[in-house]
Amino acid sequence: MKKNNYKIVSLYSFFSFQENSIIELKQNLLRIEKENDLSGLLIIASEGINGTICAEEKIIENILNLIKNIVGNNQLNIKVSYSKEKIFKKLKLKIKNEIVTMGVPEINPLEDAGTYIDSFNWNKLIKDKDTIVIDTRNHYEVSIGSFKKSINPNTKNFSEFPQWVDNNLDNHLGNENSKNIAMFCTGGIRCEKATTLLKNKGYKNIFHLKGGILKYLEDISKEESLFEGECFVFDKRVALDHELKKGSYSICHACGMPISIEDQTKVEYIEGIQCHFCINKFTDEDRKRFEERQKQINKLKVKNQEISNN
């Protein structure tokens, strides 16, 4: 495949997804995967669709047309990037209760989400002294990049966010209930639910970054950007820089934490087995399993390199 010939589309939409349409889409996607070089991860639920797909441009367009026919008049939020190689091993389709798991089934982003702020007006909003900025992502995502002076809820997963709101948000607001609350995430989907949650709890002046960090990095020049670091993504690229190209981070295959080039020079780091985040987390038996897995990965790398050289 030629340079940057993989088109990557991150997408989501909230809409009433009927069971027969879910089954039909799943069958069509599996058929396309069987006949083409398609990979990705799509999560499907009765509330909509969420995920990322990776393939040649014409295949991507065919899939988007399928999805748009189902979504109908509801907005399909899309972010596009490109890669020299596949960012997933294969296509995974998951049918779940929620397309992004918050664990608060009564909220509906279609009815009561916050106010969108586009990339070009975001800087002005978060610079306002009467605005607090909340990063709704998980702690390991925040650790490698975020907007200046944003609040880190330090959650392990998104389902912890409602409890953080109950325990902490009023402390950040103080007695100033008129403050703006600006929220952001990777692509926008978590903020659809996070802003709806806050509005349902009676908070006012709730805003969220339309298209998330990915759209902001696409729209705003590096010189004007208030985003610092890299943006974590849930695929082989691990993180993206301001040009939406693969960044400098890798993943520790033992604990799943993003690790920098500097982290990989630390004495605690052994590729595929441990890093400084997890050195005390696993048993010797675990590490033996990780070591064997890494041996198999290395063998596969050598084999693939030999094939590409021939």
From Swiss-Prot:
Key words, A-Z: Oxidoreductase, tRNA processing
The protein's Enzyme Commission number: 1.14.-.-
Full protein name: tRNA uridine(34) hydroxylase
Enzyme class: oxidoreductase
Gene it is expressed from: trhO
SMART domains linked to this entry: RHOD
KW Transcription regulation (keyword) present: no
Catalytic activities: uridine(34) in tRNA + AH2 + O2 = 5-hydroxyuridine(34) in tRNA + A + H2O
Signal peptide: none
The keyword Oxidoreductase is annotated on this UniProt entry: yes
Domain of life where this protein originates: Bacteria
Family: Belongs to the TrhO family.
GO biological process: one example: tRNA modification
Function noted in UniProt: Catalyzes oxygen-dependent 5-hydroxyuridine (ho5U) modification at position 34 in tRNAs.
